[in-house]
Each structure stands twice: as C-alpha cells, then as structure tokens.
Amino acid sequence: MIGLLFVFSVLLSFSVGYIFPFSTSNGPTVNDTLQHAIRSQRDVSKPIPIDRVEFSGVSLSSFFESEGYSSDSLSNLYGLLKENIAGVMIDLYWNEFTSKWQLCPAPFPNNITYTSSNRVVDVSWNNRTYKCDPNLSTDDIMSILNNFIRDTNTDVEANFMHVMYNLKSIHYKKSNQTINLENAYKEKNSNFNVGMDTLNDTVSLLSSYIFTPLLLEQYQSSSSKNANSSSSIRYIDSLNETQAIQKFYNQSTILMPSLQTTLLTQYKRLMVHVISNDMAESSRSYQISFSDKETIFFNNVFPAMIGHTNNASADDFCYELTHAYNGTDVNIMEFNRVSLNSTLRLIIDNDKTPFTTDSLSKYVRCGYCPVFNSTQYSSQKVTEGNSSIISQEFTSNLFWSWAPGQPSGPDNCTNCTRPVTNYTSKYSEASNGGSDEEEHSNNIAYKCVALTENGWEVSNCYEKYLFACQNKLSRNEWKLDNYTKRNYFDLDDDDCPEGYFFSLPRSNIEMLSLMTTVKQENVSYPIWIDLNDITVENCFVSGGPYAQCPYQETVTTDKFVRMIAPSFVVAMVVLVLIFLEKVFRKTPIQTNRKRYWKKAIQEYYAKNDYEGVPS
C-alpha cells in the first residue's frame, strides 16, 4: 500500500509540475528560443497601437494552387501559426452565377457529381482547370484559426492576428449567348450549397475574437472624451513611459488602441481586412452591406499599402528610410511620418522573386509585414518535429528585434553564473572609492539585452557599454553618449539628457531610427537597451533590474483538464484499492493471536481455580 501511495505521489508531482510550464501549447512543438523571441517581441510592443505591431503572413492561394482547393491543403496552417505566422491572406471569389462567396476560382456545374471518398473534382474557367472540393469554404480556414486562438488564449501565448481578403469575381458578360452558360452554372440543387452569402458570414466563426471597425469607433469616441476632460498641458517630466508612448502615437492619422488594450483588456485576437477589391463591375456584383462594414476593415477606413518583391517601390522606400540621415543629424521628421502613418504595410513575394534572408530582414526592419506567397513554401508538411520551410529558412529574419539565435546566452558558456540579487550600484561604488570595480569585472550575468548590428543579444550585465536614451515625446529621436559607458545595473534615467530616458525600441521603425542614429553618430556596438530577464528567466521586461515579470502561471481550462486527468485517474485507482482493502482484506495473524490467547487463559483458569488472594 505504501508503495502504491509513493507511485501516486510521484505521478501527481510530475503532473502538477507539467501543468505550469512557461509555455503550455499543443500541436507542433516550437523550440524554446523561438517561443521566447515571439513572446518578448510581443511584450515589448504592447504599449504601441495594433496597426504598428509587425507580423508575418502566408497566402493560402499558394497552398491551394500547388495542392488543390481542398481541406487537405490546409493541413500545414496550424503548424505555421505556431511558428510565428500571424497573418492569413485569402483570395475570395464572388460567384455571379450563384451569388455566393467561394474559395475555388471556378464555378461548379450544377450537374457535377462526386463521392464521399473522392470529393475533389476538376472544374474549368477562363481556360484554366482547377482541382476543387465543393464543400471547401472559409469555415474550414476559420475553424483552424479558432482552434489556434483557443489553444493559445492565455496572457503568455496570445498574439494578434490578421485575416486579409483579396476580393475577386467569377464574372461573365450577360447576353443571349450566355443563357446556356447560366443554365449550366446556376445553382439548382438546394442540397448542393457552395459558399457563403455575405462577407460577414465568412468570418462568423471568429466573431467573438474580432476587433471590428465598430469597436474602433467606440474606442476613438471614448479617447476623444478622455482627452477633452483631461488637462491639455502635461509636464514632460511627469509623464511615465506608457503615457509618453500614448501621447506620441495619438498624433497618428488614425487613432488606434494599443496591443495591450486590444489583446488583454478587450480580449480581441484579430482584425479582418479587405486589402484589395478586384471584383468586376456588374449588376450581379456583390454589394458591401452595413453589417460587413461593422465587422471588416476596408481601405476607406484602414488603408493597406501593398508592395511586391518584383517591384522596386518597396526597395526604394526601404533605401530612403535607412539613409534618412546626413553628417549632422538624423531625419527625425521622416521616421515620425512613417511611424504616425496608419496603414497596413505589406510586402508580398512570388515564385519569380521569392524572399531571401537578406531581403526579408530589410523589409521587416523598414516597416513592412511580409506575406509568403511563393508556392515553394507549401512543399513540406508541418508536423511535430518537422518544421516548415518558412521556419527552417527564415525564422531569424521574421523578427525586427532579436539577432539570429537570440535570446540566448553565449555558446558553450561554462561559467554563466547569475549573481543578480546582490549587485552594487554606481553610488555605492563611488562611496567605496571604486573598490567594487574588480569585483564587477569577475561577475557574469547573461540577463541583460544589448543592441548589436544584427539586432538584440543577451549580454553580460556587468559589461560596460554605451546606452540608448530616447526622447519622451519623439519616439524616433535618440541620444548616444560616446564618452560614457555603464554596466546595466548602474543605468537609470539620470544618465540621459533632460527630456530623454533610458529606453528601448518598441516597433520596427523605432528600431531602425536607433540603428540609423548609431550610423550617423559613428558610435560602436553593443549598446545597452532597457530590457532584461533578471527576475524570471526568459521573461524579458523593461524598467530596470528591479522590473517584475507580469505573468502568473496560467493555463487554459481545456489544457488544465487534459493535464490533470492522469493524476485524477491514479487518485481514483488508489482510493478504490484502499476501499477494497478495508472491505475484503483480513489479517489472519492478528485474528489467530486473539483466539489463541483467549483459549489459553480460559484453560489456565479452569486448572487453577483460585479463591481469594494467593499468598
């Protein structure tokens, strides 16, 4: 029995330990370094508006074109979402014959036949033949997104996503000669129902998670009232960092809520955009409804700026921004113009000019959100232990923040001790006459983040580097003192000029403006930024060495049930065994011992029948 209880306690301890890892995801595994990079870049971006939060996307058309328009082509989507893909671009076709939205680029003849074992059929339109499943709809895509959102719906893992529609038409010119065409493609069988009636219907499965134009309007109205009721004059010194960020980005062309507000206060996980509308002009064309406008962002509300890798416009934009400086200063106005211009800035590749590691890094750093559209990315299945081509080739290039392989300490580090609780400030060091200098030189604590020419890297907090000071009211204006170096523990806002504070970039444009300042002032890397994981390993926070990790150990209900189930089963088995022991088990040794002594005493008294007290 004791052995069973010991086994139970071991299993229970293992299960409870498993309930609260820092990452609690299901599905294809993602290496720890990538998870930490994804989460930390998201956390850094929390105070900035959601339209400035960089993401990477994938075009589903590339999967459909290479594998056919069926649900099997979506098998990689969940795995890609786990690998830091947060955008899904979809070509959506308005079928003028049936007045439905569908994913297949060709109409289905009304006499089409298919079997449950082979649902994919060949359909032709405009001199092209497609393999399409009539049952395929946007619900197949949205159900995968819904599962991913549910599986990651914790403060630790939740990210903000984008669904992007390209609207197209299955169009024909109506005439006497097209009567037979209409008869062939008009929907006649009510049991054969292909597509959705409205745009709003295509995303109805995700309705509770969508940040809508209606919510944006409510936020803007509320923000306007708060601004009018508060004082119009605020001293710069009284602003904390969050207020300073809000004050700067409130000058944007479109006032948007922060990622923190949207993701962790309103609990919204995605936006839906129509990024292009190429529907043919026709009396049978789809008419955008009021309900659509309340749910989906169109270009007149939130515009999209789309670049293509085979077009020089995106490269020209990046070149101008990365060279926005001269011998005397950085062109802050140009960086601010880009930062405050509210657009969905996309760069899309293709088979002729796919992304390279260098081009992808360039586009991400200068403010573009890449969308992988080349068919080469769909050639490999994404399973547990088998990552996608995108992840294998471009993981390090999807981040505007971290350098390749980061966040991580140095390779083969055998003495990476972390004496971070007992450090000496610059003030106590001065009072000791600099006696702590030698002690600091022997300390190692790879817990602080420095900017290098390749991006952020985890560095030894006791090293003395230059440090980044950011203007409180102008997010792209930085000061770097080439004559002053500090270790991370000695840094505070007093080391920066008036109106500046020790800070870090929170967007790709802020990052680029800092790196441009480094070039303009001709200073050397590395440079300290306000980011560390001192209090909790791999929980990167800003606010100095005393900043606390904001996360409690949380887990979704579904995951908690799945993880506690083994312990519950073991506990029930042990309870049943205890019950069976109490009911059915007897101890023969104890029972015989009782009977034997009772009989022996009775026989003794029968032979020795004393009366009175023996002498």
UniProtKB/Swiss-Prot annotation:
InterPro entries: Telomere_Capping_Maintenance (IPR051008). GO terms for cellular component: membrane. Keywords: Glycoprotein, Membrane, Signal, Transmembrane, Transmembrane helix. It holds the Pfam family TIM-barrel_MTC6. Its main location: membrane. It is a single-pass type I membrane protein. Residues 1-17 form the signal peptide. It is found in: Membrane. Residues 581-615 are cytoplasmic. The chain crosses the membrane at residues 560-580. PANTHER family: MAINTENANCE OF TELOMERE CAPPING PROTEIN 6, MAINTENANCE OF TELOMOERE CAPPING. May be involved in telomere capping. Belongs to the MTC6 family. This is Maintenance of telomere capping protein 6. It comes from Candida dubliniensis (strain CD36 / ATCC MYA-646 / CBS 7987 / NCPF 3949 / NRRL Y-17841) (Yeast).
